[in-house]
């Protein structure tokens, strides 16, 4: 075995494709290519979003999820202010797919959707149950047989009596009626000596007098024990503070011996 042989050549299963060498002569012999025409620049139809009330100032375009909304000719006629079309508002839903903040709204208790036909049933505003109208029409369209035609004869209605009264007749009729008071049953009426209760004897019970507790309480309230106590203050043993000199009595001004000029001459 030759050691110089490359072992990785065994991994190449695909057949090798021989590359054809390209020469400059073949490239020159090729047909000339037509000259390219200049491409005109694309002009975008830009819709200017200018408001006539604000002096024609440019504003950013309204974009909904990266898509520009362009108004059609029909939408321009229906709009009042400008030619912009606005997407319809879709309410937000929760994880279950229901509209949010609607769990406390009023709902139909019947479980029927609003689009369901409600003509079945009775009551004011309904048209009866299914099949009732057809049954009435079938009865009306039934044709009687020959035997039934002979038996069905026109029935003459009996004349209705006129029971109306005038005022004078009504007063006479009321005057002839006498009103009697119902008889009242007298006590002991219909009772006999041999009644069902004659065999029994009346029960006699002694009346027990109970002591009145109120009088006892009133007696206790009237008799009260009164104790006379004489309160006296104890004599004071304290001496007066300060100067202990005797106070000299004043002179009698009306004394004639002391003031002789006051005597009568």
From Swiss-Prot:
Cellular component GO terms held in the UniProt record: cytoplasm; nucleus; phagocytic vesicle
The Gene Ontology terms for molecular function here are: RNA binding
Which region ranges are annotated with the description Disordered?
1-160
* Domain of life from the UniProt record: Eukaryota
Write out the biased-composition intervals (Low complexity): 28-42
Transferase keyword on record: no
The UniProt entry, under Pfam families, shows: HABP4_PAI-RBP1
- Basic and acidic residues bias (residue ranges): 73-85, 102-119
Q: Write out the function statement from the record.
A: Ribosome-binding protein that acts as a regulator of mRNA translation by promoting ribosome inactivation.
Q: What is this protein called?
A: Uncharacterized protein DDB_G0288133
